[in-house]
């Protein structure tokens, strides 16, 4: 029987400890997607090579990430879970799609622009992998005839590039690639820094007090929440307003996601309470969430042979699926 479910693709880099922002923005939805979509969940280790150093163990981080996927409810019997580098078709398609991409559009991508700004426009030492990063991402998506990609508002640019590249290829060679669409959540797609809620929470942040990591010691989270930025409104009021109350809004986003309560309900619950009491409630709920997640994670992480077997089986399934589209691409450009 032909599977008529829409195809959904999502990936996370194993380049460091995943954050509560990763969970809220993407991973919390993964288990619920499995019944409605044909899901492919990728561990994007090739993407990680743009930022790694010799003191970082990529192999360990890949297994850590895989165990977290399972702890978040991804079922290998329902979804394809695989490691990007284990499916060589990603790299093959990446080169072909690079020939349908321009330096101009890649240099306008947010990550490259931010790096360029940081280097004060001196681009000679910027990693070429960072420039080509969005093309590899496009390859990841297009390789599986993906219909939907869960993305945050800040990631729509990458998906637009993917569609542009696919359209260029299709214009020349016919309808080879499916054009993917974004799947954007209403709330929580962009969790902000705790101390500077004008910027996104990032696992690469040099100030770790800005970030809540999924695997960190829960006691340290207490101090991070305690010191999280709020505001000076008098008397203190707890409501969602991303223009005037960035810090409070961010904490409400986090709490809403891990309790599955709508923000307007939380606003009513916290009417009239002090910020310190609100923070204590936020911490209590984060603590319960992390304890449950970490307990499940440790069970999976202890069995490396099980994790490696999941990765092996997932790679076999992913290669079978990706080879179909790659053969069509090779035939179109006459390198078959």
From Swiss-Prot:
It is an enzyme of class 6 (ligase). Belongs to the class-I aminoacyl-tRNA synthetase family. The lineage of its organism: Bacteria, Pseudomonadati, Pseudomonadota, Gammaproteobacteria, Enterobacterales. Keywords: Aminoacyl-tRNA synthetase, ATP-binding, Cytoplasm, Ligase, Nucleotide-binding, Protein biosynthesis. Its EC number is 6.1.1.2. The gene is trpS. Transmembrane segments: none annotated. This is Tryptophan--tRNA ligase. GO terms for cellular component: cytosol. L-tryptophan binds at residue 140. Homodimer. It catalyses: tRNA(Trp) + L-tryptophan + ATP = L-tryptophyl-tRNA(Trp) + AMP + diphosphate + H(+). A motif ('HIGH' region) lies at residues 14-22. One of its GO terms (biological process) is tryptophanyl-tRNA aminoacylation. A motif ('KMSKS' region) lies at residues 200-204. CDD domains: TrpRS_core. InterPro entries: aa-tRNA-synth_I_CS, aa-tRNA-synth_Ic, Rossmann-like_a/b/a_fold, Trp-tRNA-ligase, Trp-tRNA-ligase_bac-type, Trp-tRNA_synthetase. Catalyzes the attachment of tryptophan to tRNA(Trp). One of its GO terms (molecular function) is tryptophan-tRNA ligase activity.
